[in-house]
Each structure stands twice: as structure tokens, then as C-alpha cells.
Amino acid sequence: MAVSEVEIMKQIQALSRGGVRLFRNNVGFDAQNKVKYGLMPGSSDLIGWTQIEITPHHVGLKVAIFTAIEVKSEFGRIRPDQQRFVDFVDECGGISGICRSVADAKTLLNLS
């Protein structure tokens, strides 16, 4: 039986410790209160940062790198706006990717 996107997301979000912080990014519109929420249409399911150490010029300085993870189940489809957001984060020097498992997220985040 395939693991659901929600379950994969919870497992990946549990990696949020040490230098990695991931937060759920719900995107939508509440018609009753006329309020938009989330970053923007197509933005990733999990956003946050990954801390890295810069060397040699900034020896010892730790920097938070914007991190965006789009979580999909084994057969989940990536919408074009979601792919554009992931590509944009990459182009701007962030860490981003499509993850279908905790193993995918560990690889993306360089966690053992």
C-alpha cells in the first residue's frame, strides 16, 4: 500500500532539528473571511532553512539557507506552478526539491 502524501510530510517534518527547520506552508483562500494564506500559489509544502557553515572567508559563521520541500506521494503529480517555485528557489541559491519519501528529504538536506 502506498504511503500518503500527508504521512510522508509528517515524517519529513520530523527531520526538523539541529540545523534544519521545516514548517508547513498551507496555501489557499478562506472565502468566508476573504483572507489569502500561505506564501503564494505553487509554493512548497514545507519551507524553512538549512544551516550551513561557510568557509574559509566566513570561518565559523553559520548561515541559514532558505529550504523548500514539495512533498508528493509515490504517484502524486507536480503542478507546473509548484515546479516553477522549486526551480526558482534553486536558482536563487536555496535548497529545494520534490520529495516522495523521508529518504529523498534526507538526501536533499544532506542528513545521514
How should these model regions be labeled?
Residues 1-112:
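Catalytic phosphate/metal-binding cores of nucleic-acid and nucleotide-processing enzymes, i.e., regions
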